[in-house]
Curated annotation (Swiss-Prot):
Gene Ontology CC annotations of this record: nucleus
Disruption phenotype: Males are infertile and spermatocytes fail to complete meiosis and show defects in metaphase I organization.
Protein task: Transcription regulator which is essential for male fertility and for the completion of meiotic prophase in spermatocytes. Regulates progression of the pachytene stage of meiotic prophase and promotes the transcriptional activation activity ZNF541. Required for the organization of chromosomes during metaphase I.
Main location (coarse class): nucleus
Compositionally biased residues, Basic and acidic residues: 731-743
The protein's assembly and partners: Identified in a complex with ZNF541, HDAC1 and HSPA2. Identified in a complex with ZNF541 and HDAC1. Identified in a complex with HDAC1, HDAC2, DNTTIP1 and ZNF541.
Protein name per the record: BTB/POZ domain-containing protein KCTD19
Gene3D superfamilies: Potassium Channel Kv1.1, Chain A (3.30.710.10)
Disordered: region residues: 664-760
UniProt superkingdom: Eukaryota
Tissue: Detected in adult testis.
Pfam families noted in UniProt: BTB_2 (PF02214)
GO biological process, one term: male meiotic nuclear division
Length: 927
């Protein structure tokens, strides 16, 4: 056999694998020795032009032993601690020789010998370490010096740990901290240890691996240390530096109880006793931390700085095009540094920069450029840099998870098997929606929880020693199936029995609190028992029979869209033996409500745009309707805040019964009675003088429901569906494969009266659509005013095969831009529908339709549109109203036009679930 040290392979002869965030390279010659394995089948299928890394959604730490076996055909001694998990991986990857070796080991016919060459390089360091490697946009060419090389786990973001953030090749500890925790304990972040800052998270450098126990205490107020913990001196030294009184007291109590249970609780200090955390050191503004971070790097690393802001100008962000920001974007999905959260902080930022020296000059220039008076671009001019784009996020989308002192990679499908995780807004924050996720927990313990999410079964090391901490973590994730799996774990039962002699005071977590499933909102995530997932757990004992191995099949699913940093990555979906049964709670990935886990900013600030109500699960607090608008933008839209499709509830598009016929049906819009319409927030047309009286007027009000008994002609919407029936996202996963793959025959759209087309209103149901700024808010339907019916008429109405693999979509607009775009569309459609519903004379309705058409086609300016609209009889017309409405239309119309183009593209690509339309010309010609 060739000596390990003599192995040298060129980059062209290497296959690259990303296993749960661990990066491995295997020579072609070694992998070819296992021709029946899934690894060889998929890697060898790559063409020479495909320089990709195959992604496997499995535990990377365990794959080290698989990797070592691929090189040496031997097992390392260290693999004994996790044989069950190693067995599961070998079975899923169809590595039959490794399975035979594990069987022999189990039966005592194979003995492991401890030799220096058997110890993988990565195992010599704690799992809390990482080593610096260059972050590039293609697979790294790792120097393979011996078969002992078992892969590089990018536990810290490679881009962050490379120049310019850390110009070192030494091993460094790091930790991801939610900003809420930093605000509570400011001493955690200093100028020296801050590595990066985002809207929801701060990344800091730590002095020791024991720092994770400190963060765990600050979250739970409990000292949870491993059995026989020996590094108490190191931990105590770190605690003294932080000067957090309750933490210091908890560690002191633990040292007093050395030899007892490793669980010490400390009640939270009462107000006024927070020591440094409350009185000595106050919370620093974000701009102090962000600017202090940037000035540590040369201008060449920053590139050209620029300031971005929300539309109301209250929140400022700084970004650049230098190497620093490029590295951060590759790993976190966003590189915007938050500067301010309120209007008042903008003034404070200006005053702060005025007092700074030349070091802050690039920041000063960027801020001055941003604050210079600018005029809005004409509505007929769209940015040359902007193009309509619709990005698809499939269940195989790779998600990076940052958990305390570790990071992992998995797929969106895995996270959605148990949607309780993403619904847990106390523990989960999206850094960049659909790309990177911050989980507020212990990184080392989350490895076992993630394996449960993948496999539906707990796989713990044979000598697991952190039971108190693991129990605490399981309880706080609120996943019933996980709690039940721990309660049934034999190792856990044995451990609790060993602790029976200890009193309840010293050992309060002797029994695990199991969260049971009820009939609450989460019940709707349950999956049809007939449908199974691709990743199923396998018991070690159940797989001793060779028969299922020969039947094991694997398939590769290519992700249709990958994040920028993973363009070279494909996803291997491991399918295990057919007889394996999934334990726990089966669930479907096809429901998207759990994806609404919100960053902290979108709920707690009145400057944020109002939220769209989630149609399935409410994860955010409703804004208080009584609070007055506090920002210029909110004051501006207060006039039209009720123009959120006045008839949105009344002119409801009725769902059609599932019909097997392909005929085009018409659905009349339902108009509720006045009593039904009254409570709805959007039913008072503030811009119609004859529809509403002043809020201060105590007299009777005539709401939009007036005259319902004697209705005039109402709009009808002709729906056509890309598939046989209207399908919701929740129902999509429950369909049989035949239902998904059989589109309905194409239905022609009617002629829109040629050039005499005054426009149409579309109602498009589609997968959840998010912005391109990482926000977690989304829309699942769009009401669009359009004059481009010809584009839709010539579009194939058959469902795209991609639709089956769509979890959500992203438009090339920010969430805020999409929000105001929808407001503008609903305003235009509302004034038309309200005129029809109010039985206005045909001349008035025609005038309103004509004005909307001329505005949309840019044949009239926004100012002239407002003047002509308010001049129509029945509208309130005063100078104040004109100015506010003109400003609002001028602001939102460009966003609406961009949003309309994105929706058109969505329909053309066959990504809509259903489309209903109403051609407005018919109402102008009816007698």
């Amino acid at each position: 056999m060739e000596e390990p040290g003599g192995l040298h392979e060129s980059a062209e002869d290497l296959f690259h694998f990303n296993v749960g965030g661990w990066h491995f390279s295997v020579p072609r010659s070694k992998l070819a020795q296992f021709p029946d394995s899934l690894l060889w089948k998929e890697a060898s299928a790559l063409t020479s032009s495909e320089n990709q890394r195959l992604f496997i959604d499995r535990d990377g730490s365990t794959f080290r032993h698989v990797h070592y076996y691929l090189y040496t055909s031997k097992l390392s001694f260290s693999s004994c601690a996790e044989l069950n998990l190693l067995y599961e991986q070998a079975l899923g990857l169809q590595l039959m020789p490794l399975l035979q070796t594990l069987d022999n080991l189990k039966e005592g016919r194979h003995h492991l010998r401890v030799r220096p060459a058997d110890i993988p390089v990565a195992e010599r360091a704690s799992l809390n370490y990482w080593r610096t490697w260059k972050c590039i946009s293609k697979p790294s060419d790792f120097p393979i010096k011996s078969p002992a090389f078992t892969g590089l786990h990018d536990k810290a973001p490679l881009g962050l740990m490379d120049t310019p953030l850390l110009d070192t090749e030494e091993e460094v500890h790091y930790c991801f901290l939610p900003l809420d925790l930093v605000a509570k304990y400011p001493s955690l972040v200093t100028e020296d240890n801050l590595l990066w800052l985002a809207e929801t998270v701060a990344l800091i450098e730590c002095e020791c691996s024991e720092f994770r126990f400190i963060v765990n205490f600050l979250r739970s107020h409990k000292i949870l240390l491993p059995d026989n913990f020996s590094n108490i001196d190191v931990l105590e030294a770190e605690v003294e530096i932080l000067e957090i009184p309750e933490l210091t007291e908890a560690v002191r109590l633990y040292r007093m109880n050395m030899g007892g249970c490793s669980r010490t609780s400390c009640p939270p200090l009462s107000p006024g006793k927070g020591g440094r955390t409350a009185s000595v050191e106050s919370v620093k503004p974000l701009y102090l931390m962000a600017l202090g971070l940037l000035v540590k790097y040369p201008d060449s690393a920053l590139g050209q700085l620029r300031i971005e802001s929300t539309l109301d100008g209250s929140r400022l962000y700084i970004t650049g095009n230098g190497a620093l920001f490029q590295h951060v974007r590759n790993w976190l999905g966003t590189c915007r540094l938050p500067l301010t959260e309120t209007i008042s902080e903008v003034y404070e930022l200006c005053a702060f920069l005025d007092k700074r020296d030349i070091t802050y000059e690039p920041m000063k220039v960027a801020l001055k450029t941003h604050l210079e008076p600018r005029t809005l671009l004409p509505v007929d001019v769209l940015s040359e840099e902007w193009t309509a784009e619709v990005t698809i996020y499939s269940p195989q989308q790779i998600i990076k998870l940052y958990v305390g002192s570790h990071w992992y990679a998995t797929t969106l499908q895995t996270l959605m098997k148990y949607p309780e995780l993403l619904s847990n807004t106390q523990r989960v924050y999206w850094i960049a929606y659909g790309q990177t996720l911050l989980i507020h927990g212990d990184g080392q313990m989350f490895r076992h929880i993630l394996n449960f999410l993948r496999l539906g079964k707990l796989f713990l090391p044979s000598e697991f020693k952190e039971w108190p901490l693991f129990c605490q973590e399981v309880e706080e994730y609120h996943i019933p199936a996980l709690s039940e799996a721990l309660a049934q774990c034999e190792a856990y039962k044995s451990w609790t029995q060993e602790k029976e002699s200890e009193n309840e005071e010293a050992f309060p977590i002797r029994k695990l609190h199991v969260v049971t499933e009820g009939t609450g909102p989460m019940a709707e995530f349950s999956r049809d028992a007939k449908e199974t997932t691709a990743c199923m757990p396998v018991d070690f004992q159940e797989c001793s029979d060779r028969t299922p191995w020969n039947k094991a099949k694997g398939n590769l699913t290519r992700s249709s869209q990958m994040e920028e940093a993973e363009q070279y990555t494909r996803t291997i979906q491991v399918s295990l033996c057919r007889n394996a049964k999934r334990g726990g709670n089966p669930s479907t990935y096809s429901h998207c409500s759990g994806l609404c886990a919100n960053p902290r900013h979108w709920g707690g600030h009145s400057e944020s745009p109002p939220k769209k109500k989630c149609t399935t699960i409410n994860l955010t607090q409703k804004p208080d309707a009584k609070d007055p608008p506090v920002t210029p933008m909110q004051k501006l839209i207060s006039l039209v805040r009720e123009w959120d499709m006045v008839n949105c509830k009344q002119w409801e598009f009725q769902p059609l019964p599932a019909s097997r016929s392909s005929s085009v049906e018409e659905a009349s819009l339902h108009v509720p009675s006045g009593s039904e319409a009254a409570p709805q927030p959007g039913t008072s047309a503030a811009w119609k003088a004859h529809s509403i009286t002043s809020e201060k007027d105590a007299g009777p009000q005539t709401g939009p429901g007036a005259g319902v008994k004697d209705k005039g002609p109402e709009p009808t919407f002709k729906p056509y569906f890309p598939t046989k029936r209207a399908i919701t996202l929740k129902d999509w996963g429950k369909q049989r494969p035949k239902d998904r793959e059989s589109p309905a025959p194409e239905q022609p759209l009617p002629n829109a009266n040629g050039t005499d087309n005054p426009g149409a209103i579309l109602k498009v149901a589609h997968p959840p659509v998010v912005g391109n700024d990482g926000s977690c808010m989304f829309f699942e339907d769009s009401i669009i005013y359009t004059t481009q019916m010809d584009n839709i008429k010539h579009t194939s109405l058959t469902a795209s095969p991609q639709l089956r693999e769509v979890t959500f979509l992203s438009f090339s607009l920010s969430w805020e831009e999409m929000f105001y775009a929808q407001k503008c569309h609903r305003f235009l459609t509302d004034i038309i529908l309200d005129s029809i519903r109010q039985k206005d004379p045909k001349a008035i309705t025609a005038k309103v339709v004509s004005l909307a058409y001329r505005l949309w086609t840019l044949n009239i300016s926004p100012k002239q549109f407002v003047v002509d609209l308010l001049a129509i009889a029945g509208f309130k017309d005063d100078r104040h109203t004109q100015e506010r409405l003109y400003s609002w239309v001028e602001l939102t119309l460009p966003f609406a036009r961009k949003y309309g183009r994105c929706v058109d593209l969505l329909i053309q690509r066959g990504l809509s679930r259903s489309v209903s339309y109403s051609v407005l010309g018919k109402y102008l010609h009816e007698g």
